[in-house]
From Swiss-Prot:
Function as written in the Swiss-Prot or TrEMBL entry: Displays ATPase and GTPase activities.
MF annotations from Gene Ontology: ATP binding; GTP binding
Binding site for ATP: G6, M7, S8, G9, A10, G11, K12, S13
NCBIfam families noted in UniProt: PRK05416.1
UniProt protein name: Nucleotide-binding protein DNO_0399
InterPro entries with a match to the protein in the record: P-loop_NTPase, RapZ-like, RapZ-like_N, RapZ_C
Taxonomy of the source species: Bacteria, Pseudomonadati, Pseudomonadota, Gammaproteobacteria, Cardiobacteriales
GTP-binding keyword on record: yes
Record's keyword terms, sorted: ATP-binding, GTP-binding, Nucleotide-binding
Residues bound to GTP: D55, A56, R57, N58
Similarity comment text for this entry: Belongs to the RapZ-like family.
Length: 281
């Protein structure tokens, strides 16, 4: 079990989202009175790793929490992650987000005073933490990378969906990339081929007699192979939708989606291919 705590504004939400992506069962702001029972239940009945976020909203119980966690560590494998940042950085983040600090008394207290009050309140947890991260100079992506390094994990696999479609039926609203293959030779104008689709051999054989379809599929796949790593490495994307469109979504886009997918599966074996409009014509 991982206890995620630290200063408000230091990145607990980013940490929890990262942990969820890594397969953790995450609980935010669990009342401390329920912590013992929660730990016992998960230790006995669940193999999934769990992360519990605790912050200053539990102020009345924080003073006794460090002793409780020390006791629990003797019987359960618990690690404590403490997120910190400089006071001026936290104040700026609250100003930019326009969110109230959980300990701020609006009648008499300034944000700096609330931050220092929280820092003092959480001092005992800071002292017993197994992992300390200062996020003063971090972007969200930096915190995510640092957390994965500390936990000795890698980024989750990018889930890629290749979708063929017909422009006359509309571009998929969830597409991250859109490729237009209406410039390719069109088997629709061959009456004997019209009833087939791009997964069937008559269409495959007809399109492969031209250089352009195979060349476009190969070059598009190589382009994607090069740039997709940036979506996991820098942008931390969990999924990506690639749409390939022709006029009706039955022939050319289906063939290209299957061809590109066959190449990309060498690096992304879980890639999913779907043909949205293959039955609409």
């Amino acid at each position: 079990m991982l206890i995620v705590t630290g200063m408000s504004g230091a990145g607990k939400s980013v940490a929890l989202h990262t942990l969820e992506d890594l397969g953790y069962y995450c609980v935010d702001n669990l009342p401390l009175i329920l912590l013992d029972a929660f730990v016992r239940d998960f230790a006995q009945h669940h193999a999934q790793p769990v992360a519990v976020a605790i912050d200053a909203r539990n102020a009345q119980d924080i003073s006794a929490l460090s002793d409780k966690l020390q006791t629990m560590k003797s019987v359960t494998r618990i690690q404590i992650l403490f997120l910190n940042a400089q006071t001026n950085v936290l104040a700026r983040r609250f100003s930019e987000s326009r969110r109230p600090h959980p300990l701020r008394n609006f009648g008499s207290e300034q944000i700096i005073e609330a931050i220092e009050k929280e820092r003092k309140l959480l001092g005992s947890l800071n002292n017993i933490a197994d992992m300390l991260i200062d996020t003063s100079n971090y972007r969200a992506a930096d915190l995510r990378q640092q957390l994965m390094q500390l936990l000795n994990t890698t980024a989750p696999h990018l889930l890629i969906t290749l979708q063929s479609f017909g422009f006359k039926h509309g571009i998929p609203v969830n597409a991250d990339f859109v490729f237009d293959v209406r410039f390719l030779p069109n088997p629709y104008w061959e009456a004997r081929l019209r009833a087939f689709n791009g997964k069937e051999q008559p269409i495959i054989d007809w399109l492969e007699q031209f250089a352009e379809p195979r060349q476009f599929a190969q070059e598009t796949a190589h382009y994607l192979q090069h740039w997709l790593s940036y979506f996991t490495g820098q942008n931390n994307r969990a999924y990506l939708n690639i749409a390939i469109g022709c006029t009706g979504g039955q022939h050319r886009s289906v063939f290209i989606a299957e061809s590109v997918g066959a190449i990309l599966r060498q690096d992304f074996p879980d890639l999913h291919i779907e043909h949205r409009d293959i039955e609409k014509n």
